[in-house]
């Protein structure tokens, strides 16, 4: 769920170190990169974003800019969208059966109606950690459905480090995910 680590980098030749996504992106061309923070990276604040991956985030930003110069498109993850991750080849025969729905990111989730979203927590900074930023999607193909929510909080709410049910994002998302 992390973009890379400054401790585990290989030297790169395009102005950024290679680790995590920058390493994979140097080996496999991405047509599109979808990121929860693009282009501002200001949730919950720019300072918190820069501190979260200290030493590596700058390499990630340079990677994005370099890849964009080669034709990659960068987009912000759109909560509620079912078009951001569309089938590229021959989509018509699968239009009714295939969908990737963006469910949540940045502590905000799709309501299940149109493109409407709502906050999943009150904004209490004491409850916040980077896991609450995770992007969640549901892939549906016919009767098959798959959910991925990265590191979204949920589960054992009796732990002292998680004193609030407000941190249980997964249960909230389950209602619209199905």
What is each PLM-predicted segment?
Residues 3-168:
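Flexible, acidic/histidine-containing loops and adjacent segments that form or flank the divalent-metal
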Residues 168-178:
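Long, structured stretches of catalytic cores involved in phosphate-ester chemistry, encompassing
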């Amino acid at each position: 769920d992390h973009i890379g680590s400054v401790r585990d980098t290989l030297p790169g030749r395009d102005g950024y170190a290679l680790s995590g996504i920058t390493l994979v992106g140097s080996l496999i061309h991405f047509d599109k990169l979808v990121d929860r923070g693009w282009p501002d990276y200001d949730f919950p604040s720019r300072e918190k974003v820069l501190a979260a991956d200290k030493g590596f985030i700058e390499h990630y930003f340079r990677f994005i800019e370099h890849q964009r110069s080669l034709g990659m498109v960068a987009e912000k993850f759109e909560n509620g969208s079912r078009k951001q991750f569309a089938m590229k080849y021959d989509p018509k025969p699968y239009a009714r059966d295939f969908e990737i729905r963006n469910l949540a990111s940045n502590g905000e989730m799709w309501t299940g109606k149109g493109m409407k979203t709502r906050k999943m927590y009150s904004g209490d900074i004491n409850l916040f950690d980077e896991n609450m930023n995770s992007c969640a999607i549901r892939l549906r193909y016919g009767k098959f459905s798959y959910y991925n929510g990265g590191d979204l909080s949920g589960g054992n709410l009796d732990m002292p480090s998680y004193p609030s049910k407000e941190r249980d994002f997964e249960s909230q998302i389950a209602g619209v995910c199905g």
